[in-house]
Amino acid sequence: AHRMGTSRSNLVNMILAEKVEVKTPEQQMNDIFSGIEELLRTSRELVPLFAPNTQRVTVRSSLEYKYHPTVRYEVELVRGFVPGESIGTLTANFRTTSQGLLELLTRFSRCLARIESRTLPFDVSYSIENGKFSRSLAYPAKRSRGSNDTGGTLLDAGEISRAITDYVSLIDGMLKACVGGADADTLYDMYVSDLEKRDILL
C-alpha cells in the first residue's frame, strides 16, 4: 500500500473491486482525473497537475495582466457519487496581491453566478473569499437536445472528464475575456453559446 501511495483499506477495496470487476470510488476518481490530464495534454492555455490516488486535480493558467498572475483551477471530487447531490467543487485560486485584479475577479465571480442562475435547470452554490472562488459541481447528466431536462444515470469516467474539462476551459476563457475588458453582456453571450453545444451539465 505504501509503495502504491495509498492506504491499506483503499488497497483492500482495489483488490476486491478487481475480483468482482467493479470500480472503487478511488479508481473512478483516478480515471476521471487521468482523463482530464489526457484531454489537456496538448493545451497551450491550461496545464494539468495531477498526483494519482488523490481526490483532486489542479489545472494552471495565466492571465494577460500585469506580471502575468497565475490562476489555479482545483477540481476536488467527493468519494462516491450520489444522484442529485454535488460530486465535488471547482475552486479558482488567484495568485495575486493586486487589489484591482482581485476586485475584477470578484465581479467576474458574481457575474458568473447570475448567468448560471438564469440558464441552469438546477442550483449550484458559490463562495468568494480571499482571492478564491468556489463553485459546487452538480451530479452530471446528459440532457436532451433543445431541452434542459436531465436524466439521473451516472455517466462513465470519460464523459465526466470531458464535461469537467470543457467547463474549466469555458470559465478560463470567460475570465480572460473579463480581464481583457469584456462586459457582462459579452460574458453572458459566451456562456450561452457554449451551453448550446454542451450535452452534459454539471
Residue ranges of model-derived segments:
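Short, basic amphipathic alpha-helical segments that act as recognition/interaction helices
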Residues: T6-M29
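Detector for Asparagine
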Residues: N10-N13, N30, N53, N93, ...
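Glycine-rich loops and low-complexity Gly/Arg-rich segments
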Residues: V12-I15, I36-E37, T119
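Short, positively charged interaction helices/loops
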Residues: E21-T54
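Hydrophobic transmembrane signal anchors and adjacent membrane-proximal interface regions, especially
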Residues: E38, P48, V57-S61, Y73, ...
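Non-catalytic interaction/regulatory modules that flank or connect domains
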Residues: P52-K132
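Charged, low-complexity intrinsically disordered regulatory/assembly segments
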Residues: R95-L202
